[in-house]
């Protein structure tokens, strides 16, 4: 083992935060220094040259001050016996750089701790604070890291002696293995194996437990029900299916695959052909798939990997739909207990305690969103939608006074994608078909996730809890998805016959499911499974939940094609078996010469005992709202701080919202980029205005008063959120229903039944809406010992509805941004509560620690349908200036958020809403506020009346320029405050969370910027006509020069880049680095090269640096790139990850010696912003005739800060006029202030060019906003092409 010191690992503010945590834990630590240390396992000694190459390879990241380590060492490494994603990618890079004798690279974090002597207990406490026991180990000596490379002999299979010991043997195994088997399941297994005349193996029992867990089998939703002694006619699942039976319109696949599919649009899908690799549009049906999952249990144990693998698993579900599909846009949501932010505790937040084995709500909301965002970011899927609710209170509900809240959190992960018409249905698995595992190797992680998530937190052993959490490698999943993409793009020649993702239960669930669904059995070889931990037992190899894996059936004749695709994409795979005629599972183990599994499929997946739920209804006992202590002014401030209402920027800007170039409505609205969008919208392709939309609805606290009302409101809110897009008929909308319940808790089972019936049998059929997909999580309770007291925290019944719809025209989507530039205007409230104004279970009651008695509800189904249809007319006729639904916080919050988005004031009169101002302003009945032109008000009111809404419409007042927020009732002032003051209150929760998580200086700067009342918002100044197509004369000649669209494993922005060059008249060619390294392609035939954005090698060894070094340290490929850059007629562009990569190739690029490096953002966070830039005067041939132009652009990166050697280097860069783009603030001034400058680069620098102008590198993404509709905000006069299209046309013009 070789040990190589690395660079300092933590920035100054991270060290400060670590010292603060030590102080909070009463650990007397005076200083901490942390640096990376690398360990190389080599098969032969490295030569001096190879050693130098390895040293250079391991120099990466920002240049932080180094000092010799002093004090005691605590070395944090990956857990011995595991291989980290960092290790596999770093080893790949080393091999691609010619260091073939490196068997494996691994990285540790060496902490040098200074301070008074700590006792042994304190050292243990400090070690616990510095590492994640799930994934890491702590050593006190560098040599101890040798254990990382130790190899163990495989452990044998174990048998459970039921023939000798009978039932007791199974009962003991149930406890020891954490199987969560019910008594009747134990009886079933006893009968089955006794009938087979043999003892089961541990692997067979484990496989059965996972496949038949509540998590996988949904026993409660398929159970028979008796309520109050009355047999119920339907199961829960049958009531959900009733919606499809009533309205099957537009549904192509429901209830039988990894995701549901509905009809989409005929559009040009843009991808490279297999024959020549040239990108083009392919006119075909792009049907819409939809899926929403939860990952609650793992997120409670370890939030980052829990949320990351939640998103990763849901993405795999989408990709594994039909015979292979394309995930497109994602959503993430969280329900947690109270945050209790240190120094920002709120009056309604009481500490009720929690179990030690789960983390705090604050920890979940600090780490969980980062994990979910990081996976989506690295995979390359925009996260466009979400929700965030906190609830934790002692309330008087159905079961009397008890604790209700989300100690077991909800972590929601979902999204939509597209699929070809001929791939919607899975194919036939032929006898002899090869059974393949695509993706990463097996590791000893995530064991028992299905069974563990089916238990209430606190029932299982703490070690089993930790064992059941997986960890993530999104870059591997991206590689697998590229393989799936290449397969479905082959159309009828798609080699994939059948595909499933590997999730709960690992291969033990996925492979039996695959062959069973295909009507076959399977014969497998255990030792053919890719395995990074050879010491695992057969149970661990077969049942672990290592992520980023899919199982496929491939016809033998197509294996060569499949192998070729996988090799090009560097996606690992293994053929582990064959499909058999007999429906039998046989798993052979050639190492031990035995068969750990040998059982009929029907024992595993057959008719296990059906559950019966015999339950009792309980009546809600909510108390009437006590108003004595409620002041309206104080209520407003409290509600603005409540997370469900408060600004959620800290959850949004960490997530890429522009990748694909097909996002037309993200969370951020208008020139001031306020996060108040009601729904997410994507275009169906890069050549059309058809699209897809999705929205969320959930009102869980209402279930504490009325289960059915809560469910109805969730559906209603999803509809009011999506209503301001152009959908057409209501039945176009399809819903996902995610049900979370504490099954078995008094009253909850009957409440669940009532809620499902309300939606599945009544509301949705009446609206003609289908629920073709959903999921349930039935163990939403936490138990623990608090001193001498046994405590329970039970979540409210929680239904999260996600609405999906096909969109007729994405340009018609209306946002909450109030307009004061359209002449006189009118604000209308459409009150679907019809004056009920119920205050039970609202934000108001929550912030005053009450529940109330009567909640909101869907008051009139016909009016809800009429409302939707009326909005569709108004959207299609373009009569709406602004639209925002009423939800958490009520009418006052709706109006405030609209004013924030418009940076304006409102003056309204609520006299028509009754005499109870508190109820009028804070009820959360369904409804919306619309803004229309004053002269159209009468016509709009008539249209609403024609749709049955006459008694729901109230004229409120108008939006006005300025800072006023005035609410009156007749002549009485009800509430008056500055809009800017409300805006800051609304922002404070996000600010405090951001200060805790990121660089607090940046968080403070952002909060300070929100106080600038003179901020004009995003604005545009162009020095050219964006409607002029300067490439047109060259396109007319029909000569299409070739551009090499270069990608490395992990790159995710190549398709939209190709589309931009294609539109400018190029033939865009898909070139993978594996093509160049293998010699399949070279750069000689290209005049233009573009290196695309993403996460090459998952940013291991520095963003873009591993990619660059695989070029620099490969002599033939290095010469090829150098020759390209030295040809006087070539053009080269590097964007984001491609920019980072090319900046590290500067020694090969003439005139690039002054280029900087691009390193970790000053905020120490991934930054996704829509930022204003100005084109600087430079030689860049891409920016010709654009100098002086100011316009917004997509920014999405974690490492974009310009790093120069010193002041002289910066001066040389400036004096050479090589800066091509700079960040400016909304006043047009070059800035280093956050967030206008999202990465902290000196002088606002964000793009540089070579002396000749032929090579340009830039961190922002022009390719994601080359279409006007894909800009988060844009001036209304822009046409189809945004001004950024000029960059690509300049390139085409340059080539003549």
UniProtKB/Swiss-Prot annotation:
Its EC number is 6.3.5.3. Residues 304-323, 1000-1019 are annotated as: Disordered. ATP binds at residues 306-317, 677, 887. Keywords: ATP-binding, Cytoplasm, Glutamine amidotransferase, Ligase, Magnesium, Metal-binding, Nucleotide-binding, Purine biosynthesis. Residues 1043-1296 form the Glutamine amidotransferase type-1 domain. The active site is at residues 1136, 1261, 1263. GO terms for biological process: 'de novo' IMP biosynthetic process. InterPro entries: Class_I_gatase-like, FGAR-AT_N, FGAR-AT_PurM_N-like, PurL_large, PurL_linker, PurM-like_C_dom, PurM-like_C_sf, PurM-like_N_sf. PROSITE patterns: GATASE_TYPE_1 (PS51273). Coiled coil: none annotated. Residues 1000-1013 have a biased composition (Basic and acidic residues). The keyword Magnesium applies. Pathway: Purine metabolism; IMP biosynthesis via de novo pathway; 5-amino-1-(5-phospho-D-ribosyl)imidazole from N(2)-formyl-N(1)-(5-phospho-D-ribosyl)glycinamide: step 1/2. PANTHER family: PHOSPHORIBOSYLFORMYLGLYCINAMIDINE SYNTHASE. Monomer. This is Phosphoribosylformylglycinamidine synthase. It comes from Yersinia pestis bv. Antiqua (strain Nepal516). The lineage of its organism: Bacteria, Pseudomonadati, Pseudomonadota, Gammaproteobacteria, Enterobacterales. The gene is purL.
């Amino acid at each position: 083992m070789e040990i190589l010191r690395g660079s300092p690992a933590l920035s100054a503010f991270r060290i400060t935060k670590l010292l603060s945590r030590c102080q909070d834990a009463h650990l007397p630590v005076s200083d901490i220094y942390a640096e990376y240390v690398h360990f190389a396992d080599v098969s032969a000694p490295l030569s001096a040259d190879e050693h130098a190459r390895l040293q250079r390879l391991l120099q990466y990241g920002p240049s932080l001050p180094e000092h010799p380590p002093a004090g005691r060492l605590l070395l944090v490494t990956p857990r011995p016996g595991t291989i980290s994603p960092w290790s596999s990618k770093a080893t790949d890079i080393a091999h691609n750089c010619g260091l073939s004798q490196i068997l494996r690279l691994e990285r540790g974090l060496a902490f040098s701790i200074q301070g008074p002597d700590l006792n042994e207990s304190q050292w243990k406490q400090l070690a616990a604070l510095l590492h994640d026991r799930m994934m890491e180990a702590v050593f006190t000596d560098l040599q101890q890291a040798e254990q990382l490379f130790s190899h163990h002999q495989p452990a044998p299979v174990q048998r459970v002696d039921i023939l000798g010991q009978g039932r007791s043997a199974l009962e003991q195994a149930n406890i020891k293995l954490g199987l969560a088997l019910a008594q009747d399941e134990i009886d079933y297994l006893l009968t089955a194996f006794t009938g087979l005349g043999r003892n089961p193996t541990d692997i067979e029992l484990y496989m059965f437990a996972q496949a038949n867990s509540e998590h996988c089998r949904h026993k409660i939703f398929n159970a028979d029900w008796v309520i109050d002694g009355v047999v119920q006619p339907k199961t829960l699942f049958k009531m959900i299916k009733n919606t499809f039976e009533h309205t099957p319109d537009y549904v192509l696949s429901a209830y039988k695959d990894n995701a549901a599919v509905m009809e989409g649009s005929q559009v040009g899908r843009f991808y490279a052909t297999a024959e020549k690799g040239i990108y083009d549009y392919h006119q075909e049906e792009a049907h819409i798939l939809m899926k929403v999952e939860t990952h609650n249990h793992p997120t409670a144990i370890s939030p980052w990997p829990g949320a990351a693998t939640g998103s990763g698993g849901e993405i795999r579900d989408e990709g594994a739909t039909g015979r292979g599909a394309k995930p497109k846009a994602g959503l993430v949501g969280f329900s947690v207990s109270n945050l209790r932010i240190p120094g920002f505790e709120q009056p309604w937040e009481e500490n009720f305690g929690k179990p030690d084995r789960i983390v705090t709500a604050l920890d979940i909301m600090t780490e969980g969103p980062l994990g979910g965002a990081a996976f989506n970011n690295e995979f390359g899927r925009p996260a466009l939608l979400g929700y965030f609710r906190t609830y934790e209170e002692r309330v008087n509900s159905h079961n009397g006074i008890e604790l209700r809240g989300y100690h077991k959190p909800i972590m929601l992960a979902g999204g939509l994608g597209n699929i070809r018409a001929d791939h919607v249905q899975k194919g036939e698995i032929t006898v002899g078909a090869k059974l393949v595992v695509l993706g990463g190797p097996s590791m000893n992680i995530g064991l028992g996730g299905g069974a563990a998530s089916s238990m209430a937190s606190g029932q299982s052993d703490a070690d089993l809890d930790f064992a059941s959490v997986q960890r993530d490698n999104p870059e591997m999943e991206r590689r697998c998805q590229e393989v799936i993409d290449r397969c479905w793009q082959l159309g009828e020649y798609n080699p994939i016959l059948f595909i499933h993702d590997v999730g709960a239960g690992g291969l033990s669930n996925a492979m039996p499911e695959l062959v069973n669904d295909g009507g076959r059995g399977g014969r497998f070889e255990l030792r053919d499974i890719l395995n990074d931990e050879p010491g695992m037992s057969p149970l661990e190899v077969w049942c672990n939940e290592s992520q980023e894996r899919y199982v496929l059936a491939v016809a033998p004749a197509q294996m060569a094609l499949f192998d070729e695709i996988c090799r090009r994409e560097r996606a690992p795979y293994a053929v582990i078996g064959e499909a058999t005629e007999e429906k039998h599972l046989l798993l052979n183990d050639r190492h031990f010469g035995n068969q750990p599994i040998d059982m009929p499929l029907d024992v595993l997946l057959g008719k296990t005992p059906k559950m019966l739920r015999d339950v009792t209804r309980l009546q809600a006992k909510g108390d009437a709202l006590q108003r004595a202590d409620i002041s309206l002014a104080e209520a407003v401030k409290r509600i603005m701080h409540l997370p469900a209402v408060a600004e959620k920027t800290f959850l949004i800007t960490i997530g890429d919202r522009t990748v694909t170039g097909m996002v037309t409505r993200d969370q951020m609205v208008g020139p001031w980029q306020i996060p108040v969008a009601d729904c997410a919208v994507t275009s169906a392709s890069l050549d059309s205005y058809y699209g897809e939309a999705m929205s969320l609805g959930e009102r869980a606290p209402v279930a504490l008063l009325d289960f059915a009302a809560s469910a109805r409101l969730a559906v209603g809110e999803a509809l009011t959120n999506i209503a301001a897009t152009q959908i057409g008929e209501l039945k176009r909308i399809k819903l996902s229903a995610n049900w979370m319940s504490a099954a078995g808790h008094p009253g909850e089972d009957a409440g669940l039944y009532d809620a499902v019936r309300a939606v599945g049998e009544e509301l949705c059929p009446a609206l003609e809406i289908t629920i073709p997909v959903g999921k349930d999580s039935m163990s939403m309770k936490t138990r623990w010992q608090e001193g001498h007291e046994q405590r329970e925290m039970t979540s409210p019944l929680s239904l999260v509805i996600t609405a999906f719809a096909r969109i007729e025209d994405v340009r018609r989507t209306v946002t909450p941004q109030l307009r004061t530039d359209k002449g006189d205007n009118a604000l209308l409230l459409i009150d679907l509560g019809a004056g009920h104004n119920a205050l039970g279970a609202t934000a108001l009651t929550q912030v005053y620690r009450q529940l109330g008695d009567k909640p909101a509800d869907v008051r009139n189904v016909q009016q809800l349908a009429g409302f939707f249809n009326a909005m569709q007319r108004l959207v299609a006729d373009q009569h709406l200036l602004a639209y925002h639904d009423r939800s958490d916080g009520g009418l006052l919050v709706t109006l405030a958020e609209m004013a924030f988005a418009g940076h304006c004031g409102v003056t309204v009169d609520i006299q028509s809403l009754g005499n109870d101002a508190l109820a009028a302003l804070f009820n959360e009945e369904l409804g919306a506020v619309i803004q229309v032109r004053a002269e159209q008000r009468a016509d709009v009111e008539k249209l609403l009346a024609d749709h049955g809404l006459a008694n729901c419409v109230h004229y409120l007042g108008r939006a006005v320029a300025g800072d006023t927020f005035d609410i009156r009732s007749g002549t009485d002032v009800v509430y008056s405050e500055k809009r800017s003051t409300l805006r800051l209150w609304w922002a404070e929760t996000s600010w405090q969370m951001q200060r805790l998580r990121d660089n607090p200086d940046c968080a403070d700067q952002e909060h300070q910027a929100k106080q600038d009342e003179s901020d004009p918002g995003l604005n545009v100044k162009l020095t050219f006509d964006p409607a002029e197509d300067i490439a047109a004369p060259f396109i007319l000649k029909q000569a299409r020069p070739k551009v090499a669209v270069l990608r490395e494993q992990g790159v995710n922005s190549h398709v939209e880049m190709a589309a931009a060059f294609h539109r400018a008249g190029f033939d865009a060619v898909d070139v993978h680095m594996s093509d160049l390294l293998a010699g399949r392609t070279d750069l000689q035939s290209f005049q233009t090269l573009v290196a695309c954005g993403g996460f090459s090698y998952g940013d291991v060894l520095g963003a873009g640096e591993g990619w660059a070094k695989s070029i620099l340290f490969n002599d033939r490929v290095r010469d090829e790139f150098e020759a390209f850059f030295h040809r006087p007629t070539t053009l080269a562009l590097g964007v984001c990850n491609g920019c980072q990569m090319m900046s590290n190739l500067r020694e090969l690029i003439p005139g690039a010696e002054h280029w900087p490096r691009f390193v970790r953002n000053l905020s120490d966070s991934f930054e996704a912003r829509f930022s204003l830039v100005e084109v600087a005067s430079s030689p860049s041939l891409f920016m010709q005739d654009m100098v002086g132009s100011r316009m917004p652009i997509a920014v999405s990166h974690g490492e974009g800060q310009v790093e120069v050697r010193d002041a002289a280097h910066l001066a040389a860069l400036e004096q050479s006029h090589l800066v091509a783009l700079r960040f400016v603030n909304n006043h047009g001034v070059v800035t280093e202030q956050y967030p206008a400058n999202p990465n902290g680069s000196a002088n606002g620098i964000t793009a540089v060019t070579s002396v000749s102008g032929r090579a340009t590198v830039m961190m922002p993404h022009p390719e994601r906003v080359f279409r006007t509709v894909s800009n988060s905000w844009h001036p209304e006069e822009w046409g189809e092409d945004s001004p950024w299209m000029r960059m690509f046309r300049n390139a085409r013009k340059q080539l003549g």
